[in-house]
Amino acid sequence: MLEMLMQWYRRRFSDPEAIALLVILVAGFSILFFFSGLLAPLLVAIVLAYLLEWPTARLQAIGCSRRWAASIVLILFVGILLLMAFVVMPIAWQQGIYLIRDMPGMLNKLSDFAATLPRRYPALMDAGIIDAMAENMRTRMLNMGDSVVKYSLASLVGLLTLAVYLVLVPLMVFFLVKDKEQMLNAVRRVLPRNRGLAGQVWNEMNQQITNYIRGKVLEMVVVGVATWLGFLLFGLNYSLLLAVLVGFSVLIPYIGAFVVTIPVVGVALFQFGLGTEFWSCFAVYLIIQALDGNLLVPVLFSEAVNLHPLVIILSVVIIGGLWGFWGVFFAIPLATLIKAVVHAWPDGQVTDTSS
């Protein structure tokens, strides 16, 4: 048994490049695990730098210098963000306030509907249980309102931090894009010399992460806009707010779509009842989700993601549990990284040293 373990160890860890790759991976994961909070602005800047690299490279290809290309792309990107911040988000925020205001009325309708269930299905429903559930929901709604107020007050403390980030992140993005090669060379100088295997994994992952981030942003925009137009077609209340939630839900594969369906169905049900409008609106929503999963995702991520759905779900749950939001966002790239490392890891044959 011991001899088998020794042979396995020599096969897997006798290559210096494999050891160098292992050291790099352990150091990288340790830094992210222990300092993810401090590195949040840098992580945001890296994600945005990946996103802006493609248009920067296109401008550079037609004759712009790297500095001017990075400046133009960053200015356009900040302009789009400001447009979103001053046009889209205030409307979505206002609709969120209206939704919270209307929740007690929705709860009363739900309670009235639930009260009729014992009469309709006496063998399945107990009036006492229904009343207890309704009272519990009312209590939770009141507590939720208090929590929203407390959270709003507590969030004021983070406004200064947010203001600092709004200045730091664009600056970091600019320098990450403008001085990309210099920074990569600086990183290479501190890495182990035997890093051929690590370089192989990096080259594969770099392109996949680029495709993934660019594809995710495009998927969010397409799904969000399509959902908003579909909801507008039926005059659904809080259409922009729900569309924004649906757009962001694509960040969490499978789980996000399931969770965001609950408020969509709830709002449509309370507005339309179980009539034709409800089923038509819900059908349009399901069609958008189906087109996203079966058409848009394969087109955008055919080169970036080649993982089984169960692996994706487990990656979101495990990595998201370790690193929160960033774990959820990077769950698929990290799972792809693990797969690439496993495939690239040397499986050297042990030679007979006795001869």
Report each predicted region and the residues it spans.
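Membrane-interface starts of transmembrane alpha-helices
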Residues: 65-73, 126, 130, 195-199, ...
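Hydrophobic alpha-helical transmembrane segments of membrane transport and translocation systems
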Residues: 278-355
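Generic alpha-helical transmembrane segments of integral inner-membrane proteins
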Residues: 22-27, 31, 43, 71-84, ...
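Transmembrane helix boundary and interhelical junction motifs in multipass membrane proteins
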Residues: 39-43, 225-226, 236-266, 294-296, ...
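Juxtamembrane membrane-interface segments in integral membrane proteins
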Residues: 3-5, 15-19, 55-62, 68, ...
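Anchoring transmembrane alpha helix of integral membrane proteins
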Residues: 1-90, 94, 173, 335-355
